[in-house]
Amino acid sequence: MKLRWKIAQFFEAWWWRRYLKGKPLPEYLAWKRQYWFDFLKKIDVAVPPKASILDAGCGPAGIFLVFPENPVTAVDPLLAQYRPLFTHFTDGSLRNIRFVEQPMEQFVAPQQYDLVFCLNAINHVADLDLCLQRLREATRPGGSLVLSVDAHNHPFFKRVFQWVPGDILHPHQLDLSDYQQRLLAHGFEVKRALMLKQEFFFGYWVLLAS
């Protein structure tokens, strides 16, 4: 799995460089902020102004962009590769955010957070169970986890993708029940499961847990 994870990380960084090539950065960031506002509205999650937030597997333009009044910790192993692509990492515009360049498995939270986001990231990691343990440790009692992931629709294709890396960016190929059971095993209670998008192979799900 470690080799597969390293390959996935390489192609993740490559994908972002290719995706952003020729795109006006201000327009992209404006679109991304609106995407996150719409996402929060769809899942009916309100964020109090001073609530502490962890954005685990934040990527270069994660949900950390839309919380200027909150203390935020944003963690990702590829931040060094994202910095040359995005000015907000170096221009001082995100002073409320502490960026941590680290795999989620190695991140030991310095505090517990009111709200933990792990969006489009959990199926990118090397050690799924260790990452879920880290998320559990980072979520304060009474706090919430918001986890989004592409989950397989069909058992047959799930097995095919597990054996043959047809989805190179995502080392983990699981279905919704698999993710729910893993969360339960790590002490989370899943409050809601919302499907935001349905395609042939995958459904895009948001799991809200505490």
Where are these regions (language model features)?
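Class I SAM-dependent methyltransferase Rossmann-like catalytic core
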Residues: 1-45
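Class I SAM-dependent methyltransferase SAM/SAH-binding core
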Residues: 54, 58-105
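Short conserved loop adjoining the S-adenosyl-L-methionine
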Residues: 106-111
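A conserved beta-strand element that flanks and buttresses the S-adenosyl-L-methionine
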Residues: 117
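Short catalytic micro-motifs in class I SAM-dependent methyltransferases
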Residues: 120-121
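A short glycine-rich, Lys/Arg-flanked "PGG" loop and its adjoining helix->strand segment in the class I
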Residues: 129-144
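Conserved class I S-adenosyl-L-methionine
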Residues: 146-173
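Short alpha-helix
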Residues: 170-187
